[in-house]
Amino acid sequence: MLIIPAIDLKDGKCVRLRQGRMEDSTVFGDDPVDMATKWVDAGARRLHLVDLNGAFAGEPVNGEIVKAIAVKYPNLPIQIGGGIRSAETIEAYLKAGVQWVIIGTKAVKEPEFVTEMCKEFPGHIIVGLDAKDGRVATDGWAEVSEVMAVDLAKRFANDGVSSIVYTDIARDGMMQGVNVEATAKLAEEGGIPVIASGGVTNMDDLKRLATVADTGVIGAITGRAIYEGTLDVAEAQAYCDSLKN
């Protein structure tokens, strides 16, 4: 399992939100590139970037910062989400050196878009499923649909989606612990590797998540916990590495 630090971008700064609310944000750094360096130095092997302004605007807003991080760390796998709703945006990010793009809102509203993008950019598409009580939310979590996360995952099972980033909105940024059961269920029933997001607050959460790694949970994105110091990136990754032995 990989520990994947999250860098959420808002107005050019590195922030964390509580439950996806833009008005409830905490600034953790004015220079996201410096923040990326911090996590790389701590042993991160992959970064999760989110263009929060982009998620609400429907197009990239902090794209230049994403490119700057990709240029500085050309060998570091980076995944980016937020405002990715066109082939042009995907192509621009991949050309900039990003490894994966995360399709969220559009995956719910136009699932065929994911199918098309998997064909056009094979191996580079991740689907972001943000759910509340099992139902998928869209538009920066402003809207909750009637679509069940597991059903949508099954829809993409044969499309070549690299993985699914699964966020339990109720727990994101709230330091309440990860929803292990829902994450494992999605991995098992959906048939696509899952990266858990939302609620990984300490080593205990990580150890609980590790018990379901064999279902297809391949990583954990962590944000507020590493910024507030309740989880250490190096220690967490070392623990995950030890599980292989």
UniProtKB/Swiss-Prot annotation:
It comes from the Bacteria. The active site is at 8 (proton acceptor), 130 (proton donor). GO terms for biological process: L-histidine biosynthetic process; L-tryptophan biosynthetic process. It is found in: Cytoplasm. It is an enzyme of class 5 (isomerase). The keyword Isomerase applies. Its EC number is 5.3.1.16. Pathway: Amino-acid biosynthesis; L-histidine biosynthesis; L-histidine from 5-phospho-alpha-D-ribose 1-diphosphate: step 4/9. It catalyses: 1-(5-phospho-beta-D-ribosyl)-5-[(5-phospho-beta-D-ribosylamino)methylideneamino]imidazole-4-carboxamide = 5-[(5-phospho-1-deoxy-D-ribulos-1-ylimino)methylamino]-1-(5-phospho-beta-D-ribosyl)imidazole-4-carboxamide. Keywords: Amino-acid biosynthesis, Cytoplasm, Histidine biosynthesis, Isomerase. InterPro entries: Aldolase_TIM (IPR013785), His_biosynth (IPR006062), HisA_bact_arch (IPR006063), Isoase_HisA-like (IPR044524), Isoase_HisA-like_bact (IPR023016), RibuloseP-bd_barrel (IPR011060). One of its GO terms (molecular function) is 1-(5-phosphoribosyl)-5-[(5-phosphoribosylamino)methylideneamino]imidazole-4-carboxamide isomerase activity. One of its GO terms (cellular component) is cytoplasm. Belongs to the HisA/HisF family. This is 1-(5-phosphoribosyl)-5-[(5-phosphoribosylamino)methylideneamino] imidazole-4-carboxamide isomerase. It comes from Marinobacter nauticus (strain ATCC 700491 / DSM 11845 / VT8) (Marinobacter aquaeolei). The lineage of its organism: Bacteria, Pseudomonadati, Pseudomonadota, Gammaproteobacteria, Pseudomonadales.
